[in-house]
Amino acid sequence: MDMRPSPRQQELMDRAYKLAMERFAPRAATHDREASFPIEDYADLHASGLLALCVPESYGGLGADFETYCLVAEQIARGNASTALTYNMHALTMLMIGPLMQGIELPPEVRERHEQLRIGN
């Protein structure tokens, strides 16, 4: 069994690691000291596309699975653990809410609204 990341996973891990080291790490101590939210880190995650890591590709996201999410989150934590923790809450919601809702019968208008909310509209 090959446990190495796939080429796509490695590319996403590298992208996250670069952000973590170059952008998040230099700001982390200030956020810890001031007990402030790392807003700049989220702007960087958005610009890199990683904020949409677990959003389905059909909605413009990267469509990552749980394993890929874990690999990326680990790299984010190298730069700022607080960013990784809050990113966890954001990204895992995208993974959890999709599959959970797929098996539930909903009126068409409710399902449509759910899908809009899922992609942030």
Q: Residues of each region from the PLM?
A:
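N-terminal capping segment at the start of a domain
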Residues: 19-29
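Intrinsic disorder at enzyme termini
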Residues: 1-8
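Generic N-terminal segment detector
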Residues: 11-17
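Glycine-rich flavin
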Residues: 36-47, 51-121
